[in-house]
Amino acid sequence: MNLEVVAQLTVLALIVVSGPLVIGLLALRKGNL
């Protein structure tokens, strides 16, 4: 695999994982679960 492909997959994985985490943190801060 090319480094470019690995980098793109890594970025996509980080976005997919960080999305729900950010929403969860915002929900916890607001106290709305």
Curated annotation (Swiss-Prot):
It comes from the Eukaryota. A core subunit of photosystem II (PSII), probably helps stabilize the reaction center. One of its GO terms (cellular component) is photosystem II. The chain crosses the membrane at residues 5-25. Keywords: Chloroplast, Membrane, Photosynthesis, Photosystem II, Plastid, Thylakoid, Transmembrane, Transmembrane helix. The keyword Lyase does not apply. It is a single-pass membrane protein. The gene is psb30. It holds the Pfam family PSII_Ycf12. It comes from Zygnema circumcarinatum (Green alga). The keyword Transmembrane helix applies. One of its GO terms (biological process) is photosynthesis. The lineage of its organism: Eukaryota, Viridiplantae, Streptophyta, Zygnematophyceae, Zygnematophycidae. Belongs to the Psb30/Ycf12 family. PSII is composed of 1 copy each of membrane proteins PsbA, PsbB, PsbC, PsbD, PsbE, PsbF, PsbH, PsbI, PsbJ, PsbK, PsbL, PsbM, PsbT, PsbX, PsbY, PsbZ, Psb30/Ycf12, peripheral proteins of the oxygen-evolving complex and a large number of cofactors. It forms dimeric complexes. It is found in: Plastid, Chloroplast thylakoid membrane. This is Photosystem II reaction center protein Psb30.
